Amino acid sequence: MDTIKLSIVTPNGEIFNDDVKTVTLPGKEGEFGVLPGHSSLVSSLTVGVIVIEKVDSTEAVAINWGHVKVDEKSVDVLADGAIALTAGKDSEIAKNIEAAKELVNSVKDSNISVAAVEAKINSFA
């Protein structure tokens, strides 16, 4: 099965580093998906949820903003702030979801629909 290498890094360290089937990113101009063999690009990311589809599971990471570099074999995300929504025990996930909502609300960009991002975060609860 074809996969692509995804890494998500913040100033505090690495959040995710693994092979994935697909990844959906919150681009500045709208969400976009990346599959193995994708054309090379660099894009700004806005507040939202990165949805990671692995071979056997789906994970999610909330970010406040960042940048992504995509090529045929890898996706490298540099985010200012990121919180894994689906890793750990149920109590840790609940804490992470609350922390993700705080991260989203810290963004003061009027072009962002905070309610839409919070709804997506809640879908992983």
Swiss-Prot record:
It is found in: Cell inner membrane. GO terms for molecular function: ATP binding; proton-transporting ATP synthase activity, rotational mechanism. Keywords: ATP synthesis, Cell inner membrane, Cell membrane, CF(1), Hydrogen ion transport, Ion transport, Membrane, Transport. Pfam families: ATP-synt_DE_N. The keyword Amino-acid biosynthesis does not apply. It is a peripheral membrane protein. Its main location: membrane. The keyword Ion transport applies. Belongs to the ATPase epsilon chain family. Produces ATP from ADP in the presence of a proton gradient across the membrane. This is ATP synthase epsilon chain. It comes from Aliarcobacter butzleri (strain RM4018) (Arcobacter butzleri).
